[in-house]
Amino acid sequence: MKHIRNFSIIAHIDHGKSTLSDRLIQECGGLTDREMAAQVLDSMDIERERGITIKAQSVTLDYLANDGETYQLNFIDTPGHVDFSYEVSRSLAACEGALLVVDAGQGVEAQTLANCYTALEMDMDVVPVLNKIDLPQADPDRVAEEIEDIVGIEATDAVRCSAKTGVGIKDVLEVIVAQIPPPEGDPEGPLQALIIDSWFDSYLGVVSLVRIKNGVLKKGDKFKVMSTGQNYNADRVGIFTPKQTDTTELKTGEVGFVIAGIKEIHGAPVGDTLTHSKHGAEKALAGFKKVKPQVYAGLFPISTDDYENFRDALNKLSLNDASLFFEPETSSALGFGFRIGFLGLLHMEIIQERLEREYNLELITTAPTVVYEIVQTNGETIYVDNPSDLPAINNIAEMREPIVETNILVPKEYLGNVITLCIEKRGVQTNLVYHGNQVALTYELPMAEVVMDFFDRLKSTSRGYASLEYNFIRFEPADMVRLDILINGDRVDALAMIIHKGLIRSKGLALVNKMKELIPRQMFDIAVQAAVGSQIIARSSIKAMRKDVTAKCYGGDVSRKKKLLNKQKEGKKRMKQVGNVEVPQEAFLAVLKLND
């Protein structure tokens, strides 16, 4: 056991986590040069296209150290993006240490801090590594100082390497062996294995990634899942080298997979504990804290026949992604679908893309909303994540919106732009600290503003240099109202949104004008209105297409023309009463992109 090292790689987006993992795999001969592909561990197509890591992946490597001993390194490549921070905390729970990778050119960024604090809170040893030293703008000494200054861990002797060229990779491996402690646990004790991750394979059923804390799990053992009490047979156990490799047993301290032919999707939930059916452990391991979704949106299949497939797809995805929450929803405009909870907008995009790609579904999304706390006049408190569930205005005593604490790191030349943006988003500044060239800003912002387009705007005002991470702190009373869009006097539930009172006029007008462009003209006039309660605040009409009914009369009596025109008038009137207006898919998405 003293030859096992379990560690995670944590870093900000684009500081070279996945490339460093590739080099470590290559150095230890996990894959031959022929099988080596860039970003081996980013196995999803979306991950490769966007160049980001979404799912944490694990690898087991054997490394012959300078002291002549062979060490087993189990490491987990983690995502850097703020929406996936729960993936990071899950990966860290399986490790004793973490490599903190910092780009020697960019220096410390917000996610570096956030992930590092997560690791330190879990009492882990954090080993700093300066990556990308081959770049002309690299300045390792300054960055080492920044790490000590901002993060507060010793970094003068930090390993310097370049994952791209392979310089210093050997040193990284030596540091891992020297500075990360071996796992603790009792190999003789009853089995306790923590499920770190699981996914659904259509041939094998549920595949679970586990970390053995105590005891041994052998192939063929009977084990039970502690939360459900169900018993299963371990058909296959093994490790990823990154290829799936079967072994005969998983020993204390190891990380590997278990396949037990579990067919029901929630048979082995993430964060659960496995133990032997006979003489098992008494109590379960501390799991992970459940992450609460921050943003909700409605997703509807374009053809109603896909509803069942959509439900299956969501079930399978939620196994792999513990933070996904969903419940059925119906909309008069869009039919049957689901209300889904996400961690942020990137998470929402990724899930939608995975549903469309991996399960061949065509989906419509409604505008995302956050969860509001509402105190009704009868004293009852309710939580609303869907604008159409909002009670009538006269039943609401107080409405509270979620506030997040946002930590932003930005080079000082862009400080002004970022502060202007935060003020525009109704932010309150709580802290500002200078660290050399970087400024650490802390703002309290309404979550609704952060999830809409704050991230993109922040990147564009700071030329991509600012970085951010946020967490929910409390609900705060706010003047929020529901803005409805009426088309020919009918409310379209999928277009409703909850916004701040101060923005009603501008948002209402913008939305109405956008709808005017997007809804195709009909044979009759269409009125598009924005309303709050019963008060109309903006209106625009889509003019009817004109059909020239008098074209066939030339000369002749004027009463003949009048008769035809009146007949047309009657027809239009009738049409207007029964006519349905098709609202195209783009109109629903327009709500999201109003500020462009």
From Swiss-Prot:
Topology in the lipid bilayer: Peripheral membrane protein
Listed GO CC annotations: plasma membrane
Keyword presence, GTP-binding: yes
Task performed by this protein: Required for accurate and efficient protein synthesis under certain stress conditions. May act as a fidelity factor of the translation reaction, by catalyzing a one-codon backward translocation of tRNAs on improperly translocated ribosomes. Back-translocation proceeds from a post-translocation (POST) complex to a pre-translocation (PRE) complex, thus giving elongation factor G a second chance to translocate the tRNAs correctly. Binds to ribosomes in a GTP-dependent manner.
Name under which the protein is recorded: Elongation factor 4
Domain named tr-type G: residues: 2-184
Entry annotated with the keyword rRNA-binding: no
Compartment(s) of residence: Cell inner membrane
